[in-house]
Amino acid sequence: MKTLIARHKAGEHIGICSVCSAHPLVIEAALAFDRNSTRKVLIEATSNQVNQFGGYTGMTPADFREFVFTIADKVGFARERIILGGDHLGPNCWQQENADAAMEKSVELVKAYVRAGFSKIHLDASMSCAGDPIPLAPETVAERAAVLCFAAESVATDCQREQLSYVIGTEVPVPGGEASAIQSVHITHVEDAANTLRTHQKAFIARGLTEALTRVIAIVVQPGVEFDHSNIIHYQPQEAQALAQWIENTRMVYEAHSTDYQTRTAYWELVRDHFAILKVGPALTFALREAIFALAQIEQELIAPENRSGCLAVIEEVMLDEPQYWKKYYRTGFNDSLLDIRYSLSDRIRYYWPHSRIKNSVETMMVNLEGVDTPLGMISQYLPKQFERIQSGELSAIPHQLIMDKIYDVLRAYRYGCAE
């Protein structure tokens, strides 16, 4: 990460896409997409997804590292080209506890990530805990971030410190996505970004972390990009020029969250304006979802009724029976909630792919389709971009490859924006 940031600060148009997903097919696609390039791939886990207690994936940081490395070995992607990152590392998961208890767990969280070899650490102590004022004072946020940084430094080896990098700041939506419709978004003021940097510098120095400050590579701000269930707020470069100019006088770049669904031109403009780390998550699993839904429609037409997976019906039934991952995000009417379950850009389906019933139904569908020849006309109907690539010889009509290529479409846009 440090080399990439140095190249960007030296004037190169270079950025990196941060893949924020624990889905094995998304990780496989991210690694396979860059297998034949010289680029490194940044894969991040969030604190609620992966933590010392397992998170909602059931994985500790060490488990997640091995999970990613196993996929890399299968794909033929060199492990040393993978950068592992931890996102929103702080009290996010324990906000209902008092600050002392939440920070104690947060310290162990950060240590677990660093011990597992994660080298990009987002120190995010912005969340109010039980008994805290809302919002927290910037000084309190910075002081808690310094506590987390001290924890990271205390377990990092000398070799790890050479690679270790920190991201500070948190002008981002609640991890997991927006819970309501959005009409506009607040772009970070330069004064607020400067204050974030100033308070963190002061807090780090007070804790004897002057050297660690040299490892702070980025600050999270809001450049004016966001999405909800059916709306996308697109990047308007002219609105972020003050931010773009301010960061040029520092050693850092910006990290932009929720960049999903922007245009490839927007990604290029974001990187040009020094938002050099572009986070993406739901757009990748949304592309996966589109591919699986398309293949399910093809299965419906090609496979005898008694042998079909019933994949779409299984997904719907499981999500209606177990609504904990979407209930507070989606609309309440039955028809509206069904539309959101299927097609929301927030893509809450991503939390359900590991469910045994859904996983088994998708596997059945894949086996069914691997045993038949899919007419090109059907691929054109349901996966038109992939049809064009089949016609040009770039792609084969194998179900797994069709899913991969659908995810590649998202990665292609980021590659354009981050291109060296």
From Swiss-Prot:
Forms a complex with GatY. Keywords: Galactitol metabolism. The lineage of its organism: Bacteria, Pseudomonadati, Pseudomonadota, Gammaproteobacteria, Enterobacterales. The keyword Transcription regulation does not apply. It comes from the Bacteria. Pfam families: GatZ_KbaZ-like. Component of the tagatose-1,6-bisphosphate aldolase GatYZ that is required for full activity and stability of the Y subunit. Could have a chaperone-like function for the proper and stable folding of GatY. When expressed alone, GatZ does not show any aldolase activity. Is involved in the catabolism of galactitol. The gene is gatZ. GO terms for cellular component: plasma membrane. This is D-tagatose-1,6-bisphosphate aldolase subunit GatZ. Pathway: Carbohydrate metabolism; D-tagatose 6-phosphate degradation; D-glyceraldehyde 3-phosphate and glycerone phosphate from D-tagatose 6-phosphate: step 2/2. GO terms for biological process: D-tagatose 6-phosphate catabolic process; galactitol metabolic process; phosphoenolpyruvate-dependent sugar phosphotransferase system. The keyword Phosphoprotein does not apply. It comes from Escherichia coli O8 (strain IAI1). Belongs to the GatZ/KbaZ family. GatZ subfamily.
